[in-house]
Amino acid sequence: MIIKPYTKPNYETMLITNTVNDLDYEIFIAKPFDEPAKDGYGVIYVLDGNGLFETAAEITRLLTRKPKGYHSAIVVGIGYPGGEAFDTERRMYDLTMPAELENLPQRPNGEPWPNLGGADELISFFENELMPTIEQQYVIDKHKQALFGHSLGGLFVLHTLYTHSSLFSHYIASSASIWWNHQAILNEYEAFKCQLLKNDLSNALKTLMIVGGDELEYMVKDSLDLCTSMMSLHGPNFEVSWALLEHEEHVSVISGSISRAVKFLLTT
C-alpha cells in the first residue's frame, strides 16, 4: 500500500500582498484543461477561498466537461495564509463596510467584534493587483467576470456592485448579510439605483441573489425584498435573477449556491 497526498494537476496557489494595507492573501487557482473559447476564459472569483475554492473548482470542472459541457472557466479563490476554512478575523475585516458597534448585534460567541470595515481595501486589491495578475497569465473574456460570496461575502458582493459596478460582469450574492449596520447597504443601493436610472453604467450587469428556504426568516425576507426591488429596474444593461433553495439553511445552501453561480456565469 502506498499512501500519498492527493493533489490536482490544475490547481495552484500564489501569495499576493495588498499594497494598500500590507495584508497577505493566499490565492487559489483552478486552471482549465481545455483551450479558451474565442473570447477567452470566463473567471469566477470566490470569496472565502480556503473553504469554498475546491467546491467551486470541481463544480466548474463537471459543468464544463465535453461534449455537453459549457465553455471552460477559471476559478480563483481569495483566501488567507494558515489553512483555516474560514479565517473569522480576516473575513470580518475584508468583507464589511465601516459600522458603529452600537449598530451591530452581540456576536454569538459573546466576544467583542474584531477590526471591521476593510471592504474598500479589498476592492482595491481586486482592481489593482489580483485581476491584473490573472489577466496577465490567461486569455480572459472581460464580459464573463463573476464575483461570488456567501453571508458576509454576499454583503461584499452587493457593496461591490453598488459602488464599483464596472469591476465585474456577473455578481452572485448568496445569503447576503443585508442586516449589517442596520441595513446600511440599502443606502448604497439607493445611490446605485439613481445611477442606473440615469443610464450611467459603463457595462452590462447580471446579478443573482440566492438564499436557503430554511434560513432565518429575516434573511429570506431581506434578500427577497432587495431582489424584488432590483428586478423592477430590469433593462438592457441590468438583469437580476432570484433563487430560493428549498430545505437548505445557512450552511447547507452553500454548495447549491456555488453550482448556480457557476452555471449563471457560463450561461448568461
Describe each region flagged by the PLM.
Residues 1-268:
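Non-catalytic cap/lid and distal C-terminal segments of serine-dependent acyl enzymes
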